[in-house]
Amino acid sequence: MKTAFFILLIFSIFYGKAKGAEDREGFPVNRFGCTYPCYYGEDTEKCRRLCRETLGADYGYCFWYACYCENLPENVRRIKSQGFFGCSNGWWVVSTTTRKPK
């Protein structure tokens, strides 16, 4: 009985942490509400730099032709799922990212 309770407790802790991390990931958007386009290959490194160095996330990569970040700070604007974005999918400038003032 103690073993079952212990396993349930461990599962609950890991599920809670994973659930919380999911809430802080997504496609970051700039001040115009546009995602940062990428085309795999060398742009994957651009996404990593955007997510980690500029936005303060733990990790970033190119996913469905847009940069996707994991463990973003709560003050970074993002969208959760990909769709039709209504922004041009051209080259982007990292300086167009906005953050809420501290």
UniProtKB/Swiss-Prot annotation:
Annotated localization: Secreted
Tissue: Expressed by the venom gland.
Species annotation: Tityus serrulatus (Brazilian scorpion)
Function recorded in the entry: Putative sodium channel toxin.
LCN-type CS-alpha/beta domain residues: 24-102
Disulfide partners: C34-C87, C38-C62, C47-C67, C51-C69
Entry text on domains: Has the structural arrangement of an alpha-helix connected to antiparallel beta-sheets by disulfide bonds (CS-alpha/beta).
Transmembrane domains' residue ranges: none
InterPro entries: LCN-type_CS_alpha_beta_dom, Scorpion_toxin-like, Scorpion_toxin-like_sf, Scorpion_toxinL, Scorpion_toxinL/defensin
Gene Ontology annotations for the cellular component aspect, listed alphabetically: extracellular region
CDD domains: neurotoxins_LC_scorpion
Protein name: Putative sodium channel toxin Ts33
Keywords: Disulfide bond, Ion channel impairing toxin, Neurotoxin, Secreted, Signal, Toxin, Voltage-gated sodium channel impairing toxin
Annotated family: Belongs to the long (4 C-C) scorpion toxin superfamily. Sodium channel inhibitor family.
GO biological process: defense response
SMART domains: Knot1 (SM00505)
GO molecular function: sodium channel inhibitor activity; toxin activity
Signal peptide annotation: 1-20
Alphabetical list of Gene3D superfamilies matching this protein: Knottin, scorpion toxin-like
